[in-house]
Amino acid sequence: MSKSHTYVLGINAYDHDVAACLLRDGAIAFAIAKERINRHKHSTGFYHDVIDYCLRAEGITLDDVDLVVRNCYVLPVGELERRLTYQDVPEILPPKERKLAPEYPLFRSRSGKVVDISHHVAHAYSAFAVCPFKEGALMVVDGVGSYAADIAEEGHRIDNLSPLARESESYYRFEGSTLEPLKKVWLEPVTGFLADEFFNMNGLGALYSRVSSYIFSDWNKCGEVMGLAPYGRANQFKSLVAFANGSLDVPEWTEAFDQPYLPEDEKWESSPGMQHWQDLAWRVQDDTERVLIERAIWLRETTGAKNLCIAGGVGLNCVANGRIVREAGFDNVWIQPAAGDDGIAIGCAYYGHLAIHNKPRSFVMEHAFLGAPYSDRDVEAAAKKWFVTVKTCHAPDDDITAETARVLAEEKVVGWFQGGSEFGPRALGNRSILADPRKAAMKDLLNARVKHRQAFRPFAPIVLAERAAEVFEGDEDSPFMLLAKRVRPEWKERIPAIVHVDGTARVQTVRREHNERLYRLLLEFEKLTGVPVLLNTSFNIRGEPIVETPADAMKCFLSTGIDYLAMHDLLVGKSRYHRLFYPVMKWGSDVATMIKVGTGTDLSRGEA
Protein backbone atom coordinates (compact mmCIF):
# COMPACT_ATOMS: atom_id res chain seq x y z
CA MET A 1 0.00 0.00 0.00
CA SER A 2 1.44 3.38 -0.98
CA LYS A 3 1.97 5.94 1.75
CA SER A 4 -1.08 8.06 0.96
CA HIS A 5 -2.40 8.32 4.53
CA THR A 6 -1.21 9.71 7.84
CA TYR A 7 -1.11 7.09 10.59
CA VAL A 8 -0.96 7.59 14.35
CA LEU A 9 -0.66 4.63 16.70
CA GLY A 10 -1.80 4.77 20.34
CA ILE A 11 -0.73 2.16 22.88
CA ASN A 12 -1.71 1.26 26.44
CA ALA A 13 1.46 -0.56 27.42
CA TYR A 14 2.60 -3.15 29.96
CA ASP A 15 0.03 -2.96 32.72
CA HIS A 16 -3.52 -4.35 32.67
CA ASP A 17 -5.64 -4.10 29.51
CA VAL A 18 -2.78 -3.65 27.04
CA ALA A 19 -4.30 -2.32 23.80
CA ALA A 20 -3.55 -0.50 20.55
CA CYS A 21 -5.49 1.92 18.35
CA LEU A 22 -4.53 2.92 14.81
CA LEU A 23 -5.76 6.20 13.32
CA ARG A 24 -5.93 6.70 9.57
CA ASP A 25 -6.15 10.40 8.68
CA GLY A 26 -7.72 11.17 12.06
CA ALA A 27 -10.33 8.39 12.02
CA ILE A 28 -10.09 5.15 13.95
CA ALA A 29 -9.09 2.38 11.56
CA PHE A 30 -8.73 -0.47 14.06
CA ALA A 31 -8.39 -1.02 17.80
CA ILE A 32 -7.85 -4.19 19.80
CA ALA A 33 -7.10 -5.28 23.36
CA LYS A 34 -4.41 -7.87 23.97
CA GLU A 35 -6.81 -10.13 25.87
CA ARG A 36 -8.77 -10.79 22.67
CA ILE A 37 -5.63 -12.15 21.02
CA ASN A 38 -3.92 -14.16 23.77
CA ARG A 39 -7.20 -15.16 25.53
CA HIS A 40 -6.17 -13.96 29.01
CA LYS A 41 -8.44 -11.35 30.61
CA HIS A 42 -6.97 -7.92 31.38
CA SER A 43 -3.67 -8.95 29.79
CA THR A 44 -0.48 -7.18 30.79
CA GLY A 45 3.00 -7.28 29.29
CA PHE A 46 4.50 -6.42 25.94
CA TYR A 47 2.44 -4.80 23.22
CA HIS A 48 3.77 -6.25 19.96
CA ASP A 49 0.72 -8.43 19.24
CA VAL A 50 -1.82 -5.59 19.43
CA ILE A 51 0.35 -3.40 17.21
CA ASP A 52 0.85 -6.21 14.70
CA TYR A 53 -2.90 -6.88 14.67
CA CYS A 54 -3.70 -3.28 13.72
CA LEU A 55 -0.90 -3.00 11.16
CA ARG A 56 -1.86 -6.30 9.54
CA ALA A 57 -5.52 -5.30 9.36
CA GLU A 58 -4.58 -2.04 7.62
CA GLY A 59 -1.99 -3.69 5.38
CA ILE A 60 0.92 -1.49 6.47
CA THR A 61 4.15 -1.83 8.44
CA LEU A 62 5.51 0.06 11.41
CA ASP A 63 7.59 2.16 9.01
CA ASP A 64 4.35 3.59 7.60
CA VAL A 65 3.30 4.94 11.01
CA ASP A 66 4.01 8.65 11.41
CA LEU A 67 3.68 8.91 15.20
CA VAL A 68 3.43 6.55 18.18
CA VAL A 69 1.97 7.79 21.48
CA ARG A 70 2.09 5.59 24.58
CA ASN A 71 1.04 5.41 28.20
CA CYS A 72 1.69 3.09 31.11
CA TYR A 73 0.30 4.30 34.42
CA VAL A 74 3.06 2.53 36.38
CA LEU A 75 5.86 4.58 34.82
CA PRO A 76 6.43 6.39 31.52
CA VAL A 77 7.02 3.67 28.94
CA GLY A 78 10.50 4.85 28.04
CA GLU A 79 11.65 4.78 31.67
CA LEU A 80 9.98 1.44 32.30
CA GLU A 81 11.71 -0.13 29.30
CA ARG A 82 15.07 1.17 30.43
CA ARG A 83 14.48 -0.48 33.81
CA LEU A 84 13.35 -3.72 32.22
CA THR A 85 16.78 -4.18 30.70
CA TYR A 86 18.36 -4.64 34.12
CA GLN A 87 15.57 -5.28 36.63
CA ASP A 88 13.74 -8.55 37.18
CA VAL A 89 10.07 -7.57 36.93
CA PRO A 90 8.30 -10.82 35.98
CA GLU A 91 4.81 -9.47 36.57
CA ILE A 92 5.46 -6.77 33.97
CA LEU A 93 7.23 -8.88 31.34
CA PRO A 94 7.17 -12.71 31.45
CA PRO A 95 10.23 -14.63 30.19
CA LYS A 96 8.91 -15.27 26.67
CA GLU A 97 8.08 -11.61 26.13
CA ARG A 98 11.30 -10.44 27.74
CA LYS A 99 13.20 -12.37 25.09
CA LEU A 100 11.02 -10.97 22.31
CA ALA A 101 10.90 -7.33 23.41
CA PRO A 102 14.50 -6.26 22.60
CA GLU A 103 13.99 -7.45 19.01
CA TYR A 104 10.96 -5.19 18.50
CA PRO A 105 11.65 -1.78 16.92
CA LEU A 106 9.64 0.23 19.47
CA PHE A 107 11.31 -1.27 22.54
CA ARG A 108 13.53 1.42 24.07
CA SER A 109 12.97 3.52 20.96
CA ARG A 110 14.76 6.86 20.85
CA SER A 111 12.91 7.96 17.76
CA GLY A 112 11.41 11.43 17.79
CA LYS A 113 8.17 9.94 16.54
CA VAL A 114 7.61 8.03 19.82
CA VAL A 115 6.00 10.04 22.65
CA ASP A 116 4.85 9.18 26.20
CA ILE A 117 1.92 10.98 27.85
CA SER A 118 0.29 10.81 31.28
CA HIS A 119 -2.65 8.61 32.18
CA HIS A 120 -5.55 11.00 32.73
CA VAL A 121 -4.61 13.09 29.70
CA ALA A 122 -4.93 9.90 27.64
CA HIS A 123 -8.32 9.12 29.22
CA ALA A 124 -9.47 12.68 28.53
CA TYR A 125 -8.49 12.56 24.86
CA SER A 126 -10.21 9.19 24.48
CA ALA A 127 -13.51 10.90 25.26
CA PHE A 128 -13.62 14.50 24.05
CA ALA A 129 -11.66 13.84 20.84
CA VAL A 130 -14.33 11.45 19.51
CA CYS A 131 -17.49 12.78 21.16
CA PRO A 132 -20.31 14.43 19.15
CA PHE A 133 -19.99 17.81 20.94
CA LYS A 134 -18.00 20.85 19.81
CA GLU A 135 -17.56 21.98 23.41
CA GLY A 136 -18.29 20.76 26.89
CA ALA A 137 -17.00 19.55 30.24
CA LEU A 138 -15.12 16.34 30.92
CA MET A 139 -14.60 14.15 33.99
CA VAL A 140 -12.01 11.39 34.36
CA VAL A 141 -12.35 9.16 37.43
CA ASP A 142 -10.52 5.87 37.88
CA GLY A 143 -8.57 3.80 40.38
CA VAL A 144 -5.21 5.42 39.87
CA GLY A 145 -3.35 7.40 37.23
CA SER A 146 0.17 8.65 36.70
CA TYR A 147 2.57 9.81 39.41
CA ALA A 148 2.79 13.55 40.00
CA ALA A 149 6.46 13.34 39.07
CA ASP A 150 5.50 12.13 35.58
CA ILE A 151 2.88 14.78 34.78
CA ALA A 152 3.56 17.94 32.82
CA GLU A 153 -0.02 19.23 32.48
CA GLU A 154 -0.30 22.98 32.89
CA GLY A 155 -2.45 23.94 35.85
CA HIS A 156 -2.26 20.57 37.53
CA ARG A 157 0.83 20.92 39.70
CA ILE A 158 0.51 21.76 43.39
CA ASP A 159 3.31 22.99 45.63
CA ASN A 160 4.47 20.52 48.27
CA LEU A 161 2.73 17.63 46.51
CA SER A 162 4.61 14.36 46.91
CA PRO A 163 6.16 13.22 43.62
CA LEU A 164 4.68 9.80 44.47
CA ALA A 165 1.11 11.15 44.61
CA ARG A 166 -1.14 9.60 41.97
CA GLU A 167 -3.99 10.92 39.86
CA SER A 168 -7.46 9.91 41.07
CA GLU A 169 -9.89 12.38 39.45
CA SER A 170 -9.36 14.99 36.72
CA TYR A 171 -11.79 17.62 35.44
CA TYR A 172 -11.54 19.59 32.21
CA ARG A 173 -13.26 21.97 29.85
CA PHE A 174 -12.87 21.45 26.09
CA GLU A 175 -13.65 23.42 22.96
CA GLY A 176 -12.78 22.16 19.50
CA SER A 177 -9.38 20.47 19.82
CA THR A 178 -8.37 22.37 22.97
CA LEU A 179 -8.42 20.75 26.41
CA GLU A 180 -8.24 22.98 29.50
CA PRO A 181 -7.52 21.42 32.94
CA LEU A 182 -9.69 22.66 35.81
CA LYS A 183 -9.14 20.44 38.84
CA LYS A 184 -7.24 17.31 39.81
CA VAL A 185 -7.73 15.12 42.88
CA TRP A 186 -4.59 13.32 44.04
CA LEU A 187 -3.96 10.09 45.92
CA GLU A 188 -1.24 10.62 48.49
CA PRO A 189 0.78 7.46 49.13
CA VAL A 190 0.03 5.78 52.44
CA THR A 191 3.56 4.59 53.15
CA GLY A 192 5.58 6.55 50.64
CA PHE A 193 6.60 3.29 48.98
CA LEU A 194 6.54 3.25 45.18
CA ALA A 195 4.68 -0.08 44.97
CA ASP A 196 1.91 0.85 47.41
CA GLU A 197 -1.26 -0.87 46.19
CA PHE A 198 -3.57 1.76 44.73
CA PHE A 199 -6.73 0.31 46.27
CA ASN A 200 -5.33 1.14 49.71
CA MET A 201 -5.10 4.78 48.70
CA ASN A 202 -7.45 7.63 49.52
CA GLY A 203 -9.57 7.85 46.34
CA LEU A 204 -13.04 7.11 45.01
CA GLY A 205 -12.13 4.55 42.36
CA ALA A 206 -9.51 3.04 44.65
CA LEU A 207 -12.16 2.56 47.35
CA TYR A 208 -14.47 0.76 44.94
CA SER A 209 -11.63 -1.57 43.95
CA ARG A 210 -10.86 -2.14 47.63
CA VAL A 211 -14.43 -3.31 48.21
CA SER A 212 -14.18 -5.48 45.08
CA SER A 213 -11.04 -7.10 46.44
CA TYR A 214 -12.66 -7.60 49.85
CA ILE A 215 -15.83 -9.24 48.48
CA PHE A 216 -14.49 -11.09 45.43
CA SER A 217 -10.78 -11.43 46.19
CA ASP A 218 -10.07 -9.47 42.99
CA TRP A 219 -9.77 -5.68 42.67
CA ASN A 220 -11.03 -5.86 39.08
CA LYS A 221 -14.55 -7.17 39.90
CA CYS A 222 -16.16 -3.75 40.20
CA GLY A 223 -18.95 -4.76 37.82
CA GLU A 224 -19.89 -7.57 40.17
CA VAL A 225 -19.97 -5.15 43.11
CA MET A 226 -22.37 -2.95 41.14
CA GLY A 227 -24.59 -5.95 40.38
CA LEU A 228 -24.60 -7.07 44.01
CA ALA A 229 -25.42 -3.63 45.43
CA PRO A 230 -29.23 -3.69 44.92
CA TYR A 231 -29.45 -6.78 47.14
CA GLY A 232 -27.94 -4.86 50.05
CA ARG A 233 -29.82 -3.09 52.83
CA ALA A 234 -29.57 0.68 52.89
CA ASN A 235 -27.33 2.40 55.43
CA GLN A 236 -26.21 -0.70 57.34
CA PHE A 237 -22.73 0.84 57.28
CA LYS A 238 -21.90 4.48 57.79
CA SER A 239 -20.54 6.23 54.74
CA LEU A 240 -17.12 5.02 53.61
CA VAL A 241 -16.21 8.53 52.46
CA ALA A 242 -16.15 11.98 54.01
CA PHE A 243 -17.25 14.43 51.33
CA ALA A 244 -17.97 18.09 52.02
CA ASN A 245 -17.40 21.33 50.13
CA GLY A 246 -15.84 19.45 47.23
CA SER A 247 -13.22 17.78 49.43
CA LEU A 248 -13.12 13.98 49.47
CA ASP A 249 -11.51 11.85 52.16
CA VAL A 250 -11.59 8.07 52.41
CA PRO A 251 -10.95 6.98 56.01
CA GLU A 252 -8.81 3.97 56.74
CA TRP A 253 -10.32 0.53 56.22
CA THR A 254 -11.77 -0.40 59.60
CA GLU A 255 -11.62 -3.58 61.63
CA ALA A 256 -15.39 -3.88 61.20
CA PHE A 257 -14.69 -5.28 57.74
CA ASP A 258 -13.42 -8.64 58.91
CA GLN A 259 -15.32 -11.04 56.64
CA PRO A 260 -13.38 -11.00 53.38
CA TYR A 261 -14.04 -13.67 50.78
CA LEU A 262 -11.32 -16.31 50.79
CA PRO A 263 -10.68 -18.25 47.57
CA GLU A 264 -10.84 -21.57 49.40
CA ASP A 265 -14.46 -20.96 50.41
CA GLU A 266 -16.36 -23.78 48.70
CA LYS A 267 -19.71 -22.07 48.31
CA TRP A 268 -19.46 -18.32 47.94
CA GLU A 269 -23.17 -17.59 47.48
CA SER A 270 -24.23 -19.60 50.54
CA SER A 271 -21.54 -18.08 52.75
CA PRO A 272 -22.62 -16.57 56.10
CA GLY A 273 -20.89 -13.40 54.91
CA MET A 274 -23.27 -12.86 51.98
CA GLN A 275 -25.57 -10.33 53.67
CA HIS A 276 -22.52 -8.45 54.93
CA TRP A 277 -21.10 -8.29 51.40
CA GLN A 278 -24.43 -7.19 49.92
CA ASP A 279 -24.75 -4.38 52.48
CA LEU A 280 -21.19 -3.24 51.85
CA ALA A 281 -21.75 -3.28 48.07
CA TRP A 282 -24.83 -1.08 48.55
CA ARG A 283 -22.81 1.31 50.69
CA VAL A 284 -19.91 1.80 48.29
CA GLN A 285 -22.25 2.12 45.30
CA ASP A 286 -24.33 4.76 47.06
CA ASP A 287 -21.23 6.68 48.15
CA THR A 288 -19.84 6.56 44.62
CA GLU A 289 -23.06 7.82 43.06
CA ARG A 290 -23.34 10.67 45.57
CA VAL A 291 -19.79 11.91 44.99
CA LEU A 292 -19.98 11.61 41.20
CA ILE A 293 -23.27 13.50 40.99
CA GLU A 294 -21.95 16.34 43.16
CA ARG A 295 -18.74 16.47 41.12
CA ALA A 296 -20.75 16.60 37.88
CA ILE A 297 -22.99 19.38 39.21
CA TRP A 298 -19.90 21.36 40.29
CA LEU A 299 -18.42 20.87 36.84
CA ARG A 300 -21.58 22.13 35.13
CA GLU A 301 -21.81 25.16 37.42
CA THR A 302 -18.11 25.95 36.99
CA THR A 303 -18.05 25.69 33.21
CA GLY A 304 -21.61 26.52 32.21
CA ALA A 305 -21.33 23.61 29.79
CA LYS A 306 -24.38 21.84 28.44
CA ASN A 307 -22.45 18.75 27.37
CA LEU A 308 -20.52 16.26 29.51
CA CYS A 309 -18.01 13.57 28.55
CA ILE A 310 -16.91 10.78 30.89
CA ALA A 311 -13.87 8.49 30.82
CA GLY A 312 -11.83 6.44 33.29
CA GLY A 313 -12.73 3.07 34.76
CA VAL A 314 -15.41 4.47 37.09
CA GLY A 315 -17.19 5.56 33.91
CA LEU A 316 -18.18 1.92 33.37
CA ASN A 317 -20.53 2.14 36.37
CA CYS A 318 -23.78 2.30 34.41
CA VAL A 319 -25.93 2.82 37.52
CA ALA A 320 -23.99 5.95 38.49
CA ASN A 321 -24.00 7.07 34.86
CA GLY A 322 -27.77 6.81 34.74
CA ARG A 323 -28.09 9.07 37.77
CA ILE A 324 -25.62 11.60 36.31
CA VAL A 325 -27.72 11.76 33.15
CA ARG A 326 -30.92 12.28 35.13
CA GLU A 327 -29.70 14.50 37.98
CA ALA A 328 -26.57 16.48 37.06
CA GLY A 329 -28.35 18.93 34.77
CA PHE A 330 -26.43 18.47 31.52
CA ASP A 331 -28.36 18.44 28.25
CA ASN A 332 -26.18 15.67 26.81
CA VAL A 333 -23.81 13.07 28.27
CA TRP A 334 -21.38 10.96 26.21
CA ILE A 335 -19.34 8.15 27.78
CA GLN A 336 -16.34 6.55 26.11
CA PRO A 337 -17.36 2.87 25.60
CA ALA A 338 -13.80 1.79 26.39
CA ALA A 339 -13.73 3.95 29.53
CA GLY A 340 -11.24 1.61 31.22
CA ASP A 341 -7.55 1.36 30.45
CA ASP A 342 -7.99 -0.29 27.06
CA GLY A 343 -9.43 3.07 25.98
CA ILE A 344 -6.10 4.68 26.84
CA ALA A 345 -4.94 3.52 23.40
CA ILE A 346 -7.63 5.67 21.74
CA GLY A 347 -6.67 8.65 23.88
CA CYS A 348 -2.98 8.29 23.10
CA ALA A 349 -3.69 8.14 19.38
CA TYR A 350 -5.86 11.26 19.47
CA TYR A 351 -3.36 13.17 21.59
CA GLY A 352 -0.95 12.59 18.74
CA HIS A 353 -3.45 13.66 16.11
CA LEU A 354 -4.75 16.78 17.89
CA ALA A 355 -1.99 17.99 20.21
CA ILE A 356 1.15 17.00 18.26
CA HIS A 357 0.01 17.03 14.63
CA ASN A 358 -2.29 19.99 15.42
CA LYS A 359 -5.16 18.62 13.37
CA PRO A 360 -8.80 19.57 13.97
CA ARG A 361 -11.35 17.15 15.37
CA SER A 362 -13.27 15.43 12.59
CA PHE A 363 -14.25 11.94 13.77
CA VAL A 364 -17.19 10.92 15.96
CA MET A 365 -17.18 7.47 17.56
CA GLU A 366 -20.71 6.35 16.72
CA HIS A 367 -20.02 2.66 17.30
CA ALA A 368 -17.37 0.47 18.92
CA PHE A 369 -16.94 -2.18 16.19
CA LEU A 370 -13.23 -1.50 15.72
CA GLY A 371 -11.83 -5.00 15.27
CA ALA A 372 -10.62 -6.38 11.95
CA PRO A 373 -13.32 -8.14 9.91
CA TYR A 374 -12.99 -11.84 9.08
CA SER A 375 -13.69 -13.20 5.62
CA ASP A 376 -16.40 -15.66 4.65
CA ARG A 377 -13.58 -18.10 3.95
CA ASP A 378 -12.37 -17.74 7.57
CA VAL A 379 -15.88 -18.39 8.83
CA GLU A 380 -16.47 -21.39 6.56
CA ALA A 381 -13.13 -22.93 7.57
CA ALA A 382 -13.96 -22.59 11.26
CA ALA A 383 -17.41 -24.10 10.72
CA LYS A 384 -15.99 -27.31 9.26
CA LYS A 385 -16.00 -29.11 12.60
CA TRP A 386 -17.31 -32.45 13.68
CA PHE A 387 -20.78 -32.80 15.14
CA VAL A 388 -22.23 -29.66 13.54
CA THR A 389 -24.78 -28.92 10.85
CA VAL A 390 -24.43 -25.84 8.69
CA LYS A 391 -27.11 -23.90 6.84
CA THR A 392 -26.13 -21.05 4.54
CA CYS A 393 -28.56 -18.13 4.50
CA HIS A 394 -28.51 -15.34 1.95
CA ALA A 395 -30.61 -12.17 1.78
CA PRO A 396 -33.32 -11.46 0.91
CA ASP A 397 -35.15 -14.79 0.62
CA ASP A 398 -33.26 -16.81 3.21
CA ASP A 399 -31.92 -14.08 5.47
CA ILE A 400 -29.76 -15.06 8.45
CA THR A 401 -31.64 -12.53 10.59
CA ALA A 402 -35.03 -14.12 9.87
CA GLU A 403 -33.72 -17.62 10.52
CA THR A 404 -31.98 -16.55 13.73
CA ALA A 405 -35.08 -14.71 14.94
CA ARG A 406 -37.10 -17.87 14.38
CA VAL A 407 -34.89 -20.04 16.60
CA LEU A 408 -34.65 -17.28 19.22
CA ALA A 409 -38.45 -17.13 19.36
CA GLU A 410 -38.35 -20.89 19.99
CA GLU A 411 -36.31 -20.09 23.13
CA LYS A 412 -33.01 -21.30 21.70
CA VAL A 413 -29.71 -19.70 22.72
CA VAL A 414 -27.71 -18.25 19.82
CA GLY A 415 -24.09 -17.19 19.52
CA TRP A 416 -23.98 -14.15 17.22
CA PHE A 417 -20.72 -13.45 15.35
CA GLN A 418 -20.71 -10.64 12.78
CA GLY A 419 -18.28 -8.02 11.47
CA GLY A 420 -15.44 -6.59 13.51
CA SER A 421 -15.25 -7.13 17.26
CA GLU A 422 -16.24 -4.51 19.81
CA PHE A 423 -13.53 -2.46 21.48
CA GLY A 424 -14.13 -2.18 25.21
CA PRO A 425 -15.58 -4.55 27.81
CA ARG A 426 -19.15 -4.77 26.46
CA ALA A 427 -20.53 -7.13 23.83
CA LEU A 428 -22.60 -4.78 21.70
CA GLY A 429 -23.99 -7.09 19.05
CA ASN A 430 -21.07 -8.41 16.99
CA ARG A 431 -19.72 -10.88 19.57
CA SER A 432 -22.86 -11.64 21.57
CA ILE A 433 -24.88 -14.49 22.98
CA LEU A 434 -28.55 -13.73 22.34
CA ALA A 435 -31.71 -15.15 23.87
CA ASP A 436 -35.44 -14.58 24.27
CA PRO A 437 -36.12 -12.27 27.26
CA ARG A 438 -39.80 -13.21 27.70
CA LYS A 439 -39.33 -15.83 30.43
CA ALA A 440 -37.47 -15.35 33.71
CA ALA A 441 -36.21 -18.94 33.45
CA MET A 442 -33.99 -17.93 30.52
CA LYS A 443 -31.59 -16.28 32.96
CA ASP A 444 -31.16 -19.52 34.92
CA LEU A 445 -30.87 -21.53 31.71
CA LEU A 446 -28.06 -19.31 30.43
CA ASN A 447 -26.20 -19.53 33.72
CA ALA A 448 -26.57 -23.31 33.90
CA ARG A 449 -25.69 -24.10 30.29
CA VAL A 450 -23.33 -21.34 29.19
CA LYS A 451 -22.21 -18.54 31.51
CA HIS A 452 -21.94 -20.12 34.99
CA ARG A 453 -22.16 -16.63 36.54
CA GLN A 454 -23.27 -15.66 40.02
CA ALA A 455 -27.07 -15.74 40.21
CA PHE A 456 -27.30 -12.12 41.39
CA ARG A 457 -25.83 -10.73 38.17
CA PRO A 458 -28.34 -9.41 35.63
CA PHE A 459 -28.41 -9.92 31.89
CA ALA A 460 -28.74 -6.89 29.63
CA PRO A 461 -31.25 -6.01 26.91
CA ILE A 462 -30.75 -4.71 23.40
CA VAL A 463 -33.67 -2.76 21.99
CA LEU A 464 -34.66 -0.98 18.80
CA ALA A 465 -33.69 2.65 19.46
CA GLU A 466 -37.03 4.04 18.30
CA ARG A 467 -38.89 1.71 20.69
CA ALA A 468 -36.62 2.17 23.73
CA ALA A 469 -38.68 4.91 25.42
CA GLU A 470 -41.74 2.68 25.20
CA VAL A 471 -40.00 -0.10 27.16
CA PHE A 472 -37.60 1.83 29.43
CA GLU A 473 -37.89 5.13 31.29
CA GLY A 474 -35.99 8.06 29.81
CA ASP A 475 -35.40 9.04 26.20
CA GLU A 476 -31.58 9.06 26.23
CA ASP A 477 -29.77 7.06 23.57
CA SER A 478 -27.58 4.31 25.04
CA PRO A 479 -25.61 2.74 22.17
CA PHE A 480 -22.77 1.45 24.37
CA MET A 481 -24.73 -0.22 27.20
CA LEU A 482 -23.46 2.31 29.73
CA LEU A 483 -26.73 3.55 31.24
CA ALA A 484 -29.01 1.75 33.69
CA LYS A 485 -32.67 2.58 33.12
CA ARG A 486 -35.87 1.57 34.86
CA VAL A 487 -38.02 -0.92 33.01
CA ARG A 488 -41.52 0.46 32.60
CA PRO A 489 -44.05 -1.38 34.82
CA GLU A 490 -46.10 -2.67 31.89
CA TRP A 491 -43.01 -4.33 30.40
CA LYS A 492 -41.52 -5.98 33.47
CA GLU A 493 -43.63 -9.11 33.09
CA ARG A 494 -43.11 -9.21 29.33
CA ILE A 495 -39.29 -9.28 29.47
CA PRO A 496 -38.44 -10.59 32.98
CA ALA A 497 -35.12 -12.19 31.97
CA ILE A 498 -33.45 -8.77 31.68
CA VAL A 499 -34.98 -7.02 34.72
CA HIS A 500 -32.63 -6.67 37.69
CA VAL A 501 -33.85 -7.01 41.27
CA ASP A 502 -34.18 -3.20 41.54
CA GLY A 503 -36.33 -2.96 38.41
CA THR A 504 -33.57 -1.60 36.18
CA ALA A 505 -31.73 -2.85 33.12
CA ARG A 506 -28.39 -1.96 31.50
CA VAL A 507 -29.79 -0.89 28.15
CA GLN A 508 -28.24 -0.87 24.69
CA THR A 509 -30.16 0.97 21.99
CA VAL A 510 -29.63 -0.20 18.40
CA ARG A 511 -29.90 1.99 15.31
CA ARG A 512 -29.95 0.75 11.73
CA GLU A 513 -27.11 3.04 10.65
CA HIS A 514 -24.77 1.66 13.32
CA ASN A 515 -25.47 -2.07 13.01
CA GLU A 516 -27.72 -2.98 10.10
CA ARG A 517 -27.77 -6.73 10.69
CA LEU A 518 -28.45 -6.54 14.43
CA TYR A 519 -31.18 -3.99 13.80
CA ARG A 520 -32.86 -6.30 11.27
CA LEU A 521 -32.62 -9.19 13.72
CA LEU A 522 -34.52 -7.17 16.32
CA LEU A 523 -37.14 -6.26 13.71
CA GLU A 524 -37.57 -9.92 12.75
CA PHE A 525 -37.87 -10.96 16.39
CA GLU A 526 -40.48 -8.28 16.98
CA LYS A 527 -42.48 -9.53 13.98
CA LEU A 528 -42.64 -12.98 15.56
CA THR A 529 -43.16 -12.02 19.21
CA GLY A 530 -44.30 -8.41 19.43
CA VAL A 531 -41.22 -7.69 21.58
CA PRO A 532 -38.51 -5.32 20.20
CA VAL A 533 -36.00 -6.55 22.80
CA LEU A 534 -33.46 -9.38 23.00
CA LEU A 535 -31.33 -10.56 25.89
CA ASN A 536 -27.68 -9.87 25.10
CA THR A 537 -24.64 -11.16 26.97
CA SER A 538 -20.99 -11.41 26.01
CA PHE A 539 -19.90 -14.27 23.75
CA ASN A 540 -17.50 -16.04 26.08
CA ILE A 541 -17.30 -18.72 28.71
CA ARG A 542 -16.49 -18.11 32.31
CA GLY A 543 -12.96 -16.88 32.83
CA GLU A 544 -12.23 -16.08 29.18
CA PRO A 545 -12.34 -12.84 27.19
CA ILE A 546 -15.02 -12.25 24.57
CA VAL A 547 -14.37 -14.30 21.43
CA GLU A 548 -12.41 -12.58 18.67
CA THR A 549 -12.00 -15.05 15.79
CA PRO A 550 -14.35 -17.53 14.10
CA ALA A 551 -12.28 -20.31 15.69
CA ASP A 552 -12.83 -18.77 19.14
CA ALA A 553 -16.56 -18.65 18.45
CA MET A 554 -16.68 -22.29 17.36
CA LYS A 555 -14.76 -23.39 20.45
CA CYS A 556 -17.17 -21.57 22.76
CA PHE A 557 -20.18 -22.87 20.82
CA LEU A 558 -19.09 -26.51 20.90
CA SER A 559 -18.07 -26.55 24.56
CA THR A 560 -21.23 -24.95 25.97
CA GLY A 561 -24.98 -25.31 25.80
CA ILE A 562 -25.40 -22.67 23.08
CA ASP A 563 -27.93 -24.11 20.60
CA TYR A 564 -26.97 -22.28 17.40
CA LEU A 565 -24.13 -20.15 16.11
CA ALA A 566 -24.87 -17.44 13.53
CA MET A 567 -21.60 -16.47 11.80
CA HIS A 568 -22.00 -14.15 8.82
CA ASP A 569 -24.56 -15.97 6.63
CA LEU A 570 -24.03 -19.37 8.27
CA LEU A 571 -26.36 -20.78 10.89
CA VAL A 572 -24.44 -23.57 12.61
CA GLY A 573 -26.31 -26.18 14.63
CA LYS A 574 -25.29 -29.28 16.55
CA SER A 575 -25.84 -32.76 15.19
CA ARG A 576 -27.28 -35.59 17.24
CA TYR A 577 -23.76 -36.97 17.69
CA HIS A 578 -22.74 -33.80 19.51
CA ARG A 579 -25.16 -34.67 22.31
CA LEU A 580 -23.20 -37.86 22.95
CA PHE A 581 -19.86 -36.10 23.19
CA TYR A 582 -21.02 -32.84 24.79
CA PRO A 583 -20.67 -34.02 28.44
CA VAL A 584 -17.01 -34.86 27.84
CA MET A 585 -16.39 -31.57 26.02
CA LYS A 586 -18.16 -29.62 28.77
CA TRP A 587 -16.11 -31.36 31.45
CA GLY A 588 -12.91 -30.43 29.62
CA SER A 589 -14.09 -26.84 29.23
CA ASP A 590 -14.99 -26.59 32.92
CA VAL A 591 -11.62 -27.98 33.99
CA ALA A 592 -9.78 -25.52 31.73
CA THR A 593 -11.88 -22.66 33.07
CA MET A 594 -11.27 -23.62 36.70
CA ILE A 595 -7.55 -23.69 36.06
CA LYS A 596 -7.71 -20.30 34.32
CA VAL A 597 -9.66 -18.49 37.04
CA GLY A 598 -7.98 -20.32 39.90
CA THR A 599 -11.06 -21.00 42.01
CA GLY A 600 -10.84 -24.71 42.65
CA THR A 601 -14.03 -26.59 41.86
CA ASP A 602 -16.45 -23.80 42.73
CA LEU A 603 -18.58 -23.04 39.68
CA SER A 604 -20.62 -20.35 41.41
CA ARG A 605 -18.21 -17.45 40.90
CA GLY A 606 -18.09 -17.05 37.12
CA GLU A 607 -17.11 -14.04 35.10
CA ALA A 608 -19.01 -12.31 32.33
Per-region residue spans from a language model:
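Short glycine-rich phosphate-binding loop at a beta-alpha junction
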Residues: 61-73, 304-313, 415
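Short beta-strand-loop/turn "lid" adjacent to the catalytic site in phosphate-handling enzymes
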Residues: 57-103, 107-108, 116-117, 125-127
